Amino acid sequence: MRVLLASDDSGSLKEIIFNRGTNTSIKTALQPFHIDIHLNQGLSNRIDKIYHVSDSLLLLARHSGSLELVSSKRVSKDVDETNEPKYDVTEFELQDLISGLFDQSVLDTLSSKSKKKSKIEDQFVELYLIKKSAKNPIFLAATKSGNVTIIEVDLHSTKISKIASHKIKAPVEFVTLYDLDKSDKFVMAYGGEENLVRLIELSSDFKEISDIWAAKNVPFDNIGLRVPAWDVALRFLESEKNGVYNFITITKYAQLRKYSTNAEDCRPVKSITLLPKGEQLNSCKIIGDTSPLGNFQSSNFDELEFLAADSRKDVYQFNGKGRLLRKIAKGDITGFASCIAVTDKYLLQGGLDRYVRIFDLADYKLLAKIFTGGKVSDIILLEDNDLELPLTEKQLKMKKKKEAKRSIVEADEDAENEDLWNKLESKKRKVSKNDI
């Protein structure tokens, strides 16, 4: 298996090559074949997001407000063939960058008006493909300060250019694109702390952006107090009616909210408390039948299942009715799971405890656990095949014994076959003489 991850402490990209069963917390377990650091720029310039553009290109969104286009090239690793498997490693090189995509002043203004003491720090919250192209794919990058930047990547010249930029209301936790139909429309939803969900439409040339719908908060609670609004993640569902958008949000306060833009009052059609003890959630990843951007390919809220991480150390699996199905790796994760990523087969998890873990989505069995030396902000899986390991001395001896035993058995079988053949030939000759 091969993963790339963003390591905060060194501000680097790390490549790890390993097999299933790898566990660096157990000395006698299988260990990684390769861990290497690339493009390290320190904590203040750490990587917020990674996007795998092609087999030879990556986009990196850095905490300094820059987007980097990085080329990758596989080269053979020099190994002792008697002790290690053969594999290639990756070399990375910066090709182009765009900087100045943050607006810290917006967040400083919000912080000055807030009762909270902590400063809100700008960062990239989204980086994804919005328009495919064999030559010039288009990407969206969004920041907590509300900057939405549309980027074009020239695959031939390995250059990136900014083709449009827009401002939306801050602070922003997510900007989710609706990708469940083949429409030319670019409909997106965004929201954040005291920033209720809004749906916006981006024009086909990416130059104009317009509001099309805005959510209202849930009613006051049973003692007449306003309920805080802080959606941290949103995923769309399919719609059975043209122009109507259905979606779920996860709130910081561990609520699952179901919305339909067809609802008359623009409030959630349902709100469910997921965790009863005041745990705070930070993410939502739908598992099962999803679009390339992780939206749910069904219109039935009750059919979905999703993963969510809290702000302490737990990762949970829930169904669409808000029922807790399981805790993932209960007791093993010891720090905030700052990153969870889902593929069609695997759950990738990393965080404050500096480990990256790979789970099988079929049964949530831990496949690998690797200490990375830094807080993990993003992970992508490049390969899921295992390397063929050279045989140990004990295995070689066993193999030779089996081969020797097989040779003896084959020799005995050949002798028996020869004897049987001779008997048959002798019988044929006797029959022929009698016929004469």
UniProtKB/Swiss-Prot annotation:
Matching CDD domains, A to Z?
Nsa1
**What does the UniProt keyword field contain?**
Nucleus, Ribosome biogenesis, rRNA processing
Cellular component, GO annotation:
nucleolus; preribosome, large subunit precursor
Q: Name one GO biological process term.
A: rRNA processing
Q: Which InterPro entries match?
A: WD40_repeat_dom_sf (IPR036322), WDR74/Nsa1 (IPR037379)
Domain of life of the organism in this record?
Eukaryota
List locations, semicolon-separated.
Nucleus, Nucleolus
Q: What does this protein do?
A: Involved in the biogenesis of the 60S ribosomal subunit.
Question: Could you describe the subunit structure of this protein?
Answer: Component of the pre-66S ribosomal particle.
Give the family this protein belongs to, as stated in its UniProt record: Belongs to the NSA1 family.
Q: Supply the PANTHER family for this chain.
A: NOP SEVEN ASSOCIATED PROTEIN 1, WD REPEAT-CONTAINING PROTEIN 74
Q: Per its record, how is this protein called by name?
A: Ribosome biogenesis protein NSA1
Q: Which organism is it from?
A: Kluyveromyces lactis (strain ATCC 8585 / CBS 2359 / DSM 70799 / NBRC 1267 / NRRL Y-1140 / WM37)
